[in-house]
């Protein structure tokens, strides 16, 4: 355990930390010990002090723990497994889905449903093993050998594969209960880091500690103090205390470094207190010291607490391997060794294999799975196993396996299933659980406590990022003000009846649909919540419940601010009871519809699934409120929609609230005007529905009864119905959250374009995780691809580089006077602890930073960097970001075509890509689709592609690589270094950050730049043979000698005190600055600066290149037209290969159009019917919101790839990016317009209105053109909105706000004549004004109108016939009589022609082409505005040259 080392105490910290967490699970304070919860600041037990000693803290916790064992029984969990077989189901047609072939998938699903058998893929075969409580198992094997599947199986996470029913797994006497009752006792920690990005590290870990805090807490502290202390201890142990107030971040939101984020994930899992822990490559991204420290932590936890750990490691330092008790070696899903780590190497040596010098045991064991790496002893060539099956057979025949079976048998006898240990574990869990928690629950806290804790986290998240909430409140208040000003101070007479209905309709919709964007945030956080559920921290429904409560203050504020403005400015019923009822109903509707959106999100597994159906549902809810289609006009087959629609009940109640028991003076009588001045009340009638001859007013109850068939007695009944819906939807939401998980990938299977040769070959049964298997080195013929790689001559140097960034109010120096150079034909390693600034230095040197202040001197051949620098360098980032729909070859060709010099012929660039593919050994999967992690290329293949994309660009200066071996096993890491070696030998200059290099790997670097925390240089110089130059430097300056068997890369981290527990009294930064090596570096930098410009100028002169082509200094290699062409082709390809996106867009357009069309099927041309047809157009436009919600996330994903990788590499310009993304939507939306037109225009029956004038074809074409411009406007408007915003949610909020303004001012809800003068300009600038006017005039002009029975106005003539009595009025005002010869009870219809209705809403068929032209003006404006906004907000400005500091 290296306890004699000076670093021993601290190095145990992490172990102790785990230990501590377990200790606190079961503890009572012993008076003899010191209470670690009540210590002096700065003491050895204070995790926030400099002198914190993990071992001392651990001992103190141990003393507290040993008191009351009944209250805190120790909980351990081992596992034995035998005959363990795991399989998945695959298909021979692993082809890429596209818009054209996705139907074949439907056919295959149908055939599966009818019993066609799928191909079974064996993942794990005949596994046997035993890991007892307190033991550690290391799982070794290359990526795709089944390591992850094995760990997931042990932890009970079997989504996507099947454990054979005859498999035997015994968790110390427990079997079937593990998955549910004891979930959280065995946990699986995945390789990826999933956290709330805007939450701080401190809050993230406090939450985990509090969620598993035991009922009985030692030391006299409460749960909050306990959780805070545990958080501080674990952060101190993992060396992340300094990140406490920094947000965690993710790949796109800047937070802590990648290594620090990995340690946050480890710390969070540790705080879950699980007695059986499965860690899947959890050291990925950690330096060697932290990786070893992690294993030490697990070792101490196992020794003292009896915790069991199963860990897969892809690059295991020898020191880390030595902490494990047992090893499992997997070879393509077969077990080829299981036993003591100390005996594993000898087992294979005895078989006839040789372990090369300085190869670690773990690397040697893993090398057994590769025929290219394993070395056979002379004379054993024919006797050693070669295939996975042969290795497995040799293992099954071995005495070690016989002993293992005997041990498993004894274990199963000792821990019989459902025996006494099951009761012991239940008692132990019960002692920890809150009193209110069920015994059979896997959770520690009670449900109420879980909700409270999630509420606390919700508040922290809101504080960290209130932008969406604030923008929502602001947007809704603006909308309310706008609507209120349109309907300002409505008169209390009959002239405002329609306006009051329209106002209440809009108020209901605004309150009901304002929370639609909640769906987006629910999908974003789903993966995090499911991980916490697997750790048994809380029920997903507890988080759901807390988020409902967390949103209440916002909803209350929103209801008050929006509705007060709306109610009083518009002069709705000025009575206290009516006002409070209005606000109350609006608020209850908001809550109910929030539950509707949330339940929609929880019932579907992805946003793409949910959007089309939720859009149609929303359309249904909006149309069937009772306003756009009054109850009497609802068709029989669809009337039930109103009964299940909560909004319709709210609208009815608000209408009753406004009109009940009120009489409204009549403002317009029929007949009236010249000749009708002195009429009695019986001889004229109010021209409003619900009027009664002889009355000078209209009763409100009569009006709503006649127009809407509403009854006053329903007012409070409806509120009860809305509440019932609210509780029902809330229950659906909470239950679905607990049971329906997000869409997961099923394992890494290579996907090829349909028809590719790889699909025609019979596949071998590979590991499901792997698909096409590891990319083994293929024997090459002839050239290995090096001949085409340009030999470089430029020298890159930097001096006194500093980088400062503002975090909060303080300035923090990330890099501190860093010097160095990279020369052609050299491989330079950049190393340091996690968070030392390695990636930041690469970003600064590669001109990739967008924030912060850079100072110092960065030169190429003694000259400052020019505009072309970024495209002349290659930068392989740590994150493997690629376009998921492209193939490997397409990705490489895209890079080559756009980044290689324009003078290179196209065919030569494509040939060069073929050479790169050979060089990188990617021939097997060159035409495979990249896919997303899990479905497509595996980790190693992605990493090769990342490097390949940069090589394809033919970088003329140098190649930067950030963690090229991160997450890869030792074999693949070696292959990557082989590749770098090839490049180096051909003159490539390479600067590469690296974590966890083995001694053999480290030896392959020529030079090392070594940074300590704070971005300070510790060493820059040659590594030397066997790292001797490096070792001599540190020993000479006071470091301890390097043991012969030690890995120098790990040793030097210990020497400078960079390992979490190590300590040094030497200031290595100052030592370096005072060393002769530093002086020589400064001299050489000055020499390079002085001589290189002269040498390069001489070279240019002698080679007849006195004036280099201007093109080589351009910012982009390819001209703009070539950029646009290539990018456009790629985006079209991507859309074609995204069938889900296209078909969800199709479903949205077709289903919405059909729904509106058939809801208003063949609507008659009555007064209400004409209004319904107008609302048919109005409701069709409401799909606008869903259309832009579909486009925005798609665009954000594209933009992330462009801004994170392609823009910094100067692959193509922002103009090509934004234009191609706008253009690609236009053809698809043109196709959608045809479908939408056909599904809407004909069912609604508008074509019949063109028959009298024989213009059916012309007006049909005109209507399609208007629908077409609507969809083109929608897509360009979506890009206009999202161009500047980071988040689709914020852009969606603003887009919805502007969409509502367009809708409000289009002339439907309030005609131009009814608008206040101030708002006339909005009527004129709203695109929907011209759209609705054009569609309405084309749809209903130049035909006759009639009245329905309840629309006729009835009165008695003064004398004579009705015709004679009304003759003068009809000639002036229009209209017709039902029976002109009647002498009493005249039935008069005020409208005879549809053009009269059109003129009332300021629409005219003569303006159709003007309206069409104006829509194109708006479309073009959107495109220009999107480009301008993107340039203004998101394109980095040209920075000043780097300042030189002395």
UniProtKB/Swiss-Prot annotation:
Coiled coil: none annotated. Keywords: ATP-binding, Cell membrane, Glycoprotein, Membrane, Nucleotide-binding, Transmembrane, Transmembrane helix, Transport. It is a multi-pass membrane protein. SUPFAM superfamilies: P-loop containing nucleoside triphosphate hydrolases. Signal peptide: none annotated. GO terms for molecular function: ABC-type transporter activity; ATP binding; ATP hydrolysis activity. It holds the Pfam family ABC_trans_N. Gene3D superfamilies: P-loop containing nucleotide triphosphate hydrolases. Residues 104-357, 796-1038 form the ABC transporter domain. CDD domains: ABCG_PDR_domain1, ABCG_PDR_domain2. It is found in: Cell membrane. Glycans are attached at residues 9, 28, 222, 281, 305, 1344, 1359. One of its GO terms (cellular component) is plasma membrane. The chain crosses the membrane at residues 468-488, 502-522, 548-568, 577-597, 610-630, 719-739, 1147-1167, 1177-1197, 1217-1237, 1265-1285, 1301-1321, 1412-1432. SMART domains: AAA. InterPro entries: AAA+_ATPase, ABC2_TM, ABC_trans_N, ABC_transporter-like_ATP-bd, ABCG_dom, ABCG_PDR_1, ABCG_PDR_2, P-loop_NTPase. ATP binds at residues 832-839. ABC-type transporter; part of the gene cluster that mediates the biosynthesis of the sesterterpenes ophiobolins, fungal phytotoxins with potential anti-cancer activities. Acts as a specific transporter involved in ophiobolins secretion. PANTHER family: ATP-BINDING CASSETTE TRANSPORTER. Belongs to the ABC transporter superfamily. ABCG family. PDR (TC 3.A.1.205) subfamily. This is ABC-type transporter oblD. The gene is oblD.
């Amino acid at each position: 355990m290296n306890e004699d080392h000076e670093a021993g105490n601290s190095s145990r910290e992490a172990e102790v930390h785990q230990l501590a967490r377990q200790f606190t699970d079961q503890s009572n304070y012993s008076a003899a010990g010191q209470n670690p919860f009540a210590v002096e600041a700065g003491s050895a037990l204070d995790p926030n002090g400099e002198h914190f000693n993990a071992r001392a803290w651990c001992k103190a916790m141990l003393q507290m723990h040993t008191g009351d064992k009944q209250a805190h029984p120790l909980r351990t969990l081992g596992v034995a497994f035998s005959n363990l077989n795991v399989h998945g189901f695959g298909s021979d047609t692993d082809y890429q889905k596209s818009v054209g072939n996705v139907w074949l998938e439907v056919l295959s699903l149908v055939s599966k449903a009818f019993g066609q058998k799928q191909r079974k893929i064996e993942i794990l075969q005949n596994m046997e093993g035993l890991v007892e409580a307190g033991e550690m198992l290391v799982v070794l094997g290359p990526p795709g050998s089944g390591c992850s599947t094995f760990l997931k199986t042990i932890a009970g996470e079997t989504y996507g594969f099947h454990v054979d029913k005859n498999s035997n797994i015994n968790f110390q006497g427990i079997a079937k209960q593990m998955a549910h009752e004891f979930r959280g006792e065995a946990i699986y920690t995945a390789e990826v880091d999933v956290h709330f990005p805007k939450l701080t590290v401190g809050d993230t870990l406090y939450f985990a500690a509090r969620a598993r805090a035991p009922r009985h807490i030692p030391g006299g502290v409460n749960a909050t103090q306990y959780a805070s202390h545990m958080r501080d201890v674990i952060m101190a142990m993992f060396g992340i205390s300094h990140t406490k107030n920094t947000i965690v971040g993710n790949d796109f939101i800047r937070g802590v470094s990648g290594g620090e984020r990995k340690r946050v994930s480890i710390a969070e899992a540790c705080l879950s207190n699980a007695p059986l822990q499965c860690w899947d490559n959890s050291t990925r991204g950690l330096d060697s010291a932290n990786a070893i420290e992690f294993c030490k932590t697990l070792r101490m936890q196992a020794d003292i607490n009896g915790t069991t750990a199963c860990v897969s490691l892809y690059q295991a330092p020898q020191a880390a391997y030595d902490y494990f008790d047992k090893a499992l070696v997997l070879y393509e899903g077969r077990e080829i060794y299981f036993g003591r780590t100390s005996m594993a190497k000898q087992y294979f040596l005895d078989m006839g294999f040789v372990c090369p010098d300085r190869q670690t045991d773990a690397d040697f064991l893993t090398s057994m799975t590769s025929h290219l790496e394993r070395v056979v002893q002379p004379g054993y060539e024919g006797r050693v196993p070669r295939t996975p099956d042969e290795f497995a057979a040799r293992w099954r025949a071995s005495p070690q396996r016989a002993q293992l079976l005997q041990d498993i048998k004894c274990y199963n006898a000792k821990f019989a299933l459902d025996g006494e240990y099951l009761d012991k574990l239940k008692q132990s869990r019960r002692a920890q659980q809150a009193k209110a928690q069920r015994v059979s629950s896997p959770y520690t806290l009670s449900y109420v406590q879980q909700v409270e804790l999630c509420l606390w986290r919700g508040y922290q998240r809101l504080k960290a990022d209130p932008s969406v909430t604030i923008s929502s409140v602001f947007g809704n208040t603006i909308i309310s003000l706008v609507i209120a000003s349109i309907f300002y101070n409505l008169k209390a007479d009959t002239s405002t009846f329609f306006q009051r209905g329209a106002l209440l309709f809009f108020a209901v919709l605004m309150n009901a649909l304002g929370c639609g964007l909640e769906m987006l945030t629910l999908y974003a956080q789903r993966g995090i919540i499911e991980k916490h559920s697997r750790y048994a921290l809380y029920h997903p429904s507890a988080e759901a419940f807390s988020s409902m409560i967390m949103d209440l203050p916002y909803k209350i504020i929103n209801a008050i601010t929006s509705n007060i403005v709306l109610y009083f400015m518009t002069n709705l019923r000025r009575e206290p009871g009516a006002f409070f009822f209005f606000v109350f109903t609006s608020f209850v509707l908001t809550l109910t519809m929030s539950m509707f959106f949330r339940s929609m999100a929880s019932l579907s597994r992805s946003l793409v699934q949910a959007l089309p159906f939720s859009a149609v549902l929303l359309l249904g809810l909006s149309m069937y409120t009772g306003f756009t289609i009054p109850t009497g006009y609802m068709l029989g087959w669809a009337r039930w929609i109103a009964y299940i629609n909560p909004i319709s009940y709210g609208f009815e109640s608000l209408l009753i609230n406004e009109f009940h028991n009120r009489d409204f003076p009549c403002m317009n009588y029929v007949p009236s005007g010249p000749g009708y001045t002195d009429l009695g009340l019986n001889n004229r009638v109010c021209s409003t529905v619900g009027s009664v001859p002889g009355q000078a007013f209209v009763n409100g109850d009569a009006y709503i009864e006649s127009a809407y068939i509403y009854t006053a007695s329903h007012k409070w009944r409806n509120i009860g119905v809305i509440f019932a819906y609210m509780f029902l939807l809330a229950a659906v939401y909470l239950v679905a959250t607990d049971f329906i998980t997000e869409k997961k990938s099923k394992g890494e299977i290579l996907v090829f374009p349909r028809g590719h040769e790889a699909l025609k070959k019979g596949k071998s049964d590979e590991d499901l995780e792997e698909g096409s298997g590891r990319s083994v080195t293929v024997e090459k013929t002839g050239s290995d691809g090096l001949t085409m790689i340009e030999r470089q001559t430029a020298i890159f140097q930097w001096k006194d580089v500093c980088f400062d960034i503002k975090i909060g109010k303080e300035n923090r120096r990330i890099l501190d006077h860093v010097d160095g150079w990279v020369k052609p034909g050299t491989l330079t390693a950049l190393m340091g602890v996690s968070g030392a600034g390695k990636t930041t230095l690469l970003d600064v040197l590669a001109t990739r930073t967008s924030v912060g202040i850079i100072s110092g001197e960065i030169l190429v051949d003694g000259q400052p960097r020019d505009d072309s620098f970024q495209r002349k360098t290659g930068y392989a980032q740590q994150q493997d970001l690629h376009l998921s729909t492209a193939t490997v070859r397409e990705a490489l060709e895209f890079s080559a075509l756009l980044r290689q010099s324009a003078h290179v012929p196209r065919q030569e660039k494509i040939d060069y890509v073929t050479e790169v593919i050979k060089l990188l050994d990617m021939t097997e999967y060159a035409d495979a689709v990249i896919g997303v992690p899990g479905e497509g290329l595996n980790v190693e293949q992605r990493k090769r592609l990342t490097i390949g994309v940069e090589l394809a660009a033919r970088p003329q200066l140098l190649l930067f690589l950030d963690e090229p071996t991160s997450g890869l096993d030792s074999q693949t890491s070696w292959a990557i270094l082989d590749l770098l070696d090839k490049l180096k030998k051909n003159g490539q200059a390479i600067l590469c950050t690296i974590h966890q290099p083995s001694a053999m790997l480290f030896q392959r670097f020529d030079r090392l730049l070594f940074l300590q925390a704070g971005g300070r240089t510790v060493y820059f110089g040659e590594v030397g043979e066997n790292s001797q130059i490096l070792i001599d430097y540190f020993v000479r300056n006071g470091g301890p000698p390097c043991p012969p068997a030690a890995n120098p890369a790990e040793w030097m981290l210990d020497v400078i005190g960079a390992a979490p527990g190590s300590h040094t009294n030497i200031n290595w930064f100052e030592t370096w600055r005072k060393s002769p090596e530093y002086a020589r570096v400064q001299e050489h930098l000055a020499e390079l600066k002085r001589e290189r410009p002269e040498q390069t100028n001489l070279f240019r002169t002698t080679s007849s290149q006195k004036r280099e082509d201007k093109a080589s200094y351009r910012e982009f290699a390819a001209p703009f037209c070539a950029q646009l062409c290539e990018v456009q082709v790629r985006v079209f390809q991507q859309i074609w290969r995204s069938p889900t996106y296209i078909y969800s867009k199709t479903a949205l357009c077709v289903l919405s159009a059909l729904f509106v069309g058939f809801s208003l099927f063949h609507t008659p041309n009555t007064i209400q019917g004409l209004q319904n047809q107008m609302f048919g157009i109005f409701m069709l436009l409401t799909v606008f919101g869903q259309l832009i919600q579909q486009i925005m996330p798609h665009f954000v994903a594209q933009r992330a790839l462009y801004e994170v990788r392609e823009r910094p590499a100067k692959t193509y310009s922002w103009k090509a990016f934004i234009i191609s993304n706008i253009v690609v939507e236009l053809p698809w939306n043109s196709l959608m317009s045809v479908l939408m037109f056909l599904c809407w225009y004909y069912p609604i029956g508008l074509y019949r209105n063109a028959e009298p004038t024989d213009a059916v074809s012309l007006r049909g074409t005109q209507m399609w053109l208007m629908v077409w411009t609507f969809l083109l406007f929608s897509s360009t408007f979506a890009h206009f909105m999202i161009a500047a915003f980071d988040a689709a949610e914020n852009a969606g909020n603003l887009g919805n706000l502007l969409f509502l303004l367009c809708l409000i001012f289009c002339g439907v809800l309030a005609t131009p004549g009814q608008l206040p003068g101030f708002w006339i300009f909005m009527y004129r600038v709203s695109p929907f004004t011209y759209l609705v006017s054009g569609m309405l005039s084309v749809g209903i002009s130049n035909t006759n109108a009639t009245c329905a029975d309840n629309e006729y106005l009835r009165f008695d003539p003064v004398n004579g016939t009705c015709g004679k009595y009304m003759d003068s009025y009809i000639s002036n005002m229009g209209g017709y009589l039902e029976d002109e010869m009647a002498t009493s009870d005249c039935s008069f219809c005020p409208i005879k022609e549809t053009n009269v209705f059109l003129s009332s809403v300021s629409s005219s068929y003569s303006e159709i082409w003007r309206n069409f032209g104006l829509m194109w003006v708006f479309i073009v404006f959107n495109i220009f505005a999107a480009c301008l906004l993107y340039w203004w907000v998101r394109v980095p400005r040209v920075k000043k040259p780097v300042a030189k500091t002395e």
